[in-house]
Amino acid sequence: MNTDIYKRAGWIATTNIYEVNIRQYSNEGTFNAFAKALPRLKDMGVEVLWFMPIHPIGKINRKGTLGSYYSIMDFKAVNPELGTETDFKNLVKLAHDAGMKVIMDWVANHAAWDNVWTNNHPEYFVRDDNGNFMPPYNWTDVIQINHSNPAQQDAMIDAMKYWITNFDIDGFRADLAHLTPLDFWKKARTSIEPLKPDLFWLAESEEINYHEVFDASFTWEWMHSTENFYKGNIHLNSLYNVLAKYETAFPATAYRMYFTSNHDENTWNGTAIEKYGDMLKALTVFNCTWNGLPMIYSGEEIPNQKRLKFFDKDVIEWNDKYELHDFYKTLLALRKNNAALRTADPAVTTFHIITEGGKNIMAFLRKNDHDEVLVFLNLSKEKTGFIIKDQLINGTYTNVFTKANVGLVPDTFIEMQPWDYLLFERKL
């Protein structure tokens, strides 16, 4: 597998992602209403805004009152419920002025039954022997796109170019990327990249070979495994096995995106608090310090305790506290400013730290020649004590959250509260 076909934008290595659900973000559910949140998100340290699909939604076989964001009528239009094209263009500019990037959710595998192509280009879709459009799987509100049609591929790529040329977006999150052939994505990136070479390509997939095209991919196995761990279904060693698999099976240059929630998980499987309970903050520390890209879903900074409806209006229940705002701000600032947390950087090494006692202690060190980040996570409902038994830990470290300086050497005893986390950094 050749992962050197395309040049990855340098800014991605230290970035983070915030998934935006415009419909549920405010009572208005519009671009203009969301724009009011940009100063708060900038202060929190958010860098990439991933917008769920913003296109008009199909009416035929629609689910619920508003339909699925992923049932698209027109790939070159804006859903009027969210605002106008001018509104979106202004939002992109405001985000750019705030130092943020904007990526769009892109659905290349299926479209609405009343997609504009169905009238003039029915050959763009898979049909049965009687010429009827066919839904993929049991997704009754969408129909399957015919990936073997070169003209369809060209039309889809042209639509992607439209948003770069006219709105200056910064990349794509490919919905269910692996359901669309890799050859299409190669064709798309090869054709689109000259328009804006520093685009970000994110795949909703764990298919390893898709990293030939995509900069980053989802860590679904890790997400499900951590939930099973919290429920007591598996042991900590199983989590280490997933991380080892990621390290050996995926290219060293592959960026992996870690998350505790997204639009699907929140609606269908539960909020992050439901799934992870008291482990949530420790897991978030992991997501922001391990070798990967952290992603935050709309409302996690509250934290959101509501399962949002997928096909109907169901606004996030905001308050003025944003209890996790400063927590995320601290983590995202560390990730941005400490070079030991650069993703897939050959100058950075990750070490599992040897400890004695505390069977559910996860300890790791990330370092380069100048910086270190040291992480201890008590992934247990019990107060746990342990002893550092690793020669790599020897010096004065700064607690990232309290700013207190702490001397840590081999044989240092540490006691941690249930589901607690300790995060240190130091300059070498």
Q: How would you name each of these model-derived features?
A:
Residues 1-50, 56, 89, 93-94, ...:
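Carbohydrate-interacting/catalytic domains
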Residues 3-17, 23-32, 38-47, 53-167, ...:
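Substrate-binding/active-site clefts of carbohydrate-active enzymes
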Residues 16-18, 49-51, 102-104, 172, ...:
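Hydrophobic faces of well-ordered beta-strands that scaffold small-molecule active sites
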Residues 23-25, 54, 107-109, 177-179, ...:
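Active-site beta-loop-alpha junctions enriched in small/polar residues
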Residues 30-33, 83-87, 151-156, 180, ...:
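Soluble or luminal CAZymes and related metallo-dependent hydrolases
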Residues 165, 175-256, 286, 303-334, ...:
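Active-site-proximal helices and loops of the catalytic beta/alpha 8
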Residues 251-275:
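Active-site clefts of carbohydrate-active enzymes
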Residues 281-289:
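Hydrophobic targeting/anchoring helices
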